[in-house]
Amino acid sequence: MKFMKKSLRKRIWTILIAIISVLLSLNLGATLYFYQIACVRNNQPIGQVKTSSPNYSLVQKFNKLPKSTETLTNNDLKLDAWYVPAEQKTNNTVIVVHGFRQDKSVMRQYGQLFHELGYNVLMPDNRGAGNSQGNFISFGYHDKFDVIAWAKYLTDKNPESHISLYGLSMGASTVMMASSEKSLPSSVKNIIEDCGYTNAWDEIVYQAKESYNIPAFPLVYSVSLESKIRQGWFFQEASATKALAKDKLPILLIHGSKDTYVPTSMVYENYKSVKLGTPKELLVVKNAAHARSFETNPTLYRQTISKFMKTYNP
C-alpha cells in the first residue's frame, strides 16, 4: 500500500512537471514572438499619407524643398536626419519625431507644416528605423537621449538656437520623456505631443488585450523581462507621465477623440501629470483616429500649433 501511494505521488509530480515545462516552453515561444513584433527593427514603415488625404499636397510640397542629410553618433549608433532650412533665416528649429514602425518620411506633412510656419525643421530617423543604425525599438526609453543629442547638435552649430520638440505617437511619448532630463539643453523652449501614450507598459498591456485578447500576466511580464535582458529597460520605465511630473517646459497635448490605438483617455492622464505651474494646453480633435488629428481637421490643428508656437517659440 505504501509503495502504491509513493508511486502515485511520483506519477503526479511527473505529470505536473511535464505540464509546467510545456507551459513554460509555450510562454517562452510567445515571449520571443511578441518581443519580435514589439521591439525588433522592421524596415517596412507604416502610416504614409495616402493620396486621398487632404494633407497629401503638403507631402508633395515637402518633397520639393531643399534639404540636407545630417548625421551624429549616440551610444555608438549612427543616426540620420533631414534638415530643412526656413525660407527666411531664423534661429528657431523644430525637431519632428516619428512614431512606432515609421521613419522620417512618414512625417513629411508635419515637416511642411512647420516649414510654412517659418521654422527650420530637423526630422530624424529614430534608432532602429530608416537610415539610422540600431536593431531594437525602445518606445522612447533610449530614443529620448537621441532627441537630446540632436538638440545639442543644433545648439552646437548655432548657440542662438531656440528649439521646439514635436512628436507623433511613440515620438510624442519620446519628446515627453525627454522633457525632464537634466541633459536637455536650455535651447529647447517648448514641446508638442500628438497622441502619445502614458508609458510603454500601459500601451503594450492595452494592445495585448485589444489586438490579441491576451491578459497582462504572464506574457507582457515576460516580454518586459526580455526587454530588460536585451535592452536594459522594463516597459514601466519608458514613462511619459513620470517625466511630465518634472517637466518645466510649456507643452501642447493633442489627441483624437476616436483614437483606439493609443486610447484617448491617455491624453487626460498625461495632461494631469504635467508639473504644477508648467504652462499646458490640450486639444482633443473631434472624430480623429490615431495620428489622424491633422488630417481630420487641418485648419484647427494648424491654428492651434501656430498660436502655441508664437507664444512659446516665436
Residue locations for each model-derived region?
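Catalytic active-site module of serine/aspartate enzymes centered on a nucleophile-bearing elbow/loop
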Residues: 296-314
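Short alpha-helix in the alpha/beta-hydrolase fold that links the catalytic acid
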Residues: 110, 240, 249, 263-272
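Short beta-strand/loop motif that positions the catalytic acidic residue
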Residues: 246-248, 253-255, 259
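An N-terminal hydrophobic leader/cap segment in hydrolases
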Residues: 12, 16, 21-73
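Conserved alpha/beta-hydrolase
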Residues: 111-133
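Hydrolase active-site cap/lid region
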Residues: 177-233
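Alpha/beta-hydrolase active-site loop
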Residues: 137-158
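Catalytic histidine-centered segment of alpha/beta-hydrolase-like enzymes
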Residues: 288-298
